[in-house]
């Protein structure tokens, strides 16, 4: 059986942010570095977290980019050490939480960040010295608040994963109230990320019934509420269910992901118009139909009737084309439906394919993908 580890403290409810101080005290954090971004600060959400930690010595790092980078990890880790911090509180989307995980490594371990990347054999080098982290998500997508991994763009342009149980947040404070002001476009993109996690981890071939059950329930919640949350950001029930779907997708994906993510990781590391950082959730939505078509005849998918089980969770008719349903949902949400719309060109394929073949998600796809397979998926996603 696959290794199963669900030991994060999770608080999921409206008003949960008020528990921040008591959670810090439980964990032993007295001087937290609050890791966030300018948008969360401007929305007043960061201040709500600071107010909830009244009496603690809170330092603030608010320069998280749209995709976390090694350079920003270095800068924040230096602030962590200079301020004498003893823990981290990440308030934001997956970028802030992943950046905080990078800080948790670099502020407490020697050497360059790249030596701790999963594909460099770095997981074993991450020890229990890693700084303790509390995660407060303000989007519903990555589920990084309950995950042991982080995705960070390195100085050399590679977008790599860092995985260790020592990076698992000590507490996930999931307050849907913090997502009520999230713009429609970001609600849709992050929501499709959560849906991708639930679908892809369910299709991963490892034997892990608890993960499968969590993923299917998360998919039903996400698929059933993403349009409502996008249409009406103040819909509290939809926001609660999307936050749960996000959390559940990440709880389950310890089972493994697949080609959606092995493609979206290198795609997210591309420089488009001189800038790095295509949105991860949007990329997942765009490439997912091609990957679903590729995986349809995978042995474990056929043996376990997994597409029929996905249809039931998504409330689709028997025999419905799941790939087309995902594409149609992306259209209804107003997201880009092709990589070309996002600035990707065919001359970038070789770099993306090279990254996909060594990505940590490549090995857990239900069907082995070759370079030619990845090229076809990219062509179909343009």
UniProtKB/Swiss-Prot annotation:
Keyword Signal part of the UniProt annotation: no
MF annotations from Gene Ontology: 4-hydroxybutyrate dehydrogenase activity; alcohol dehydrogenase (NAD+) activity; metal ion binding; nucleotide binding
Residues bound to NAD(+): 37, 67, 94-98, 138-142, 159, 280
Enzyme Commission number(s) from the entry: 1.1.1.61
Catalytic activity: 4-hydroxybutanoate + NAD(+) = succinate semialdehyde + NADH + H(+)
Resulting phenotype, residue 265 to D: Retains very low activity
A matching Pfam family: Fe-ADH
Residues engaged in binding Fe cation: 193, 197, 261, 280
Role this protein plays: Involved in the degradation of 4-hydroxybutyrate. Catalyzes the interconversion of gamma-hydroxybutyrate (GHB) and succinic semialdehyde (SSA).
Protein name: 4-hydroxybutyrate dehydrogenase
Species whose genome carries this gene: Cupriavidus necator
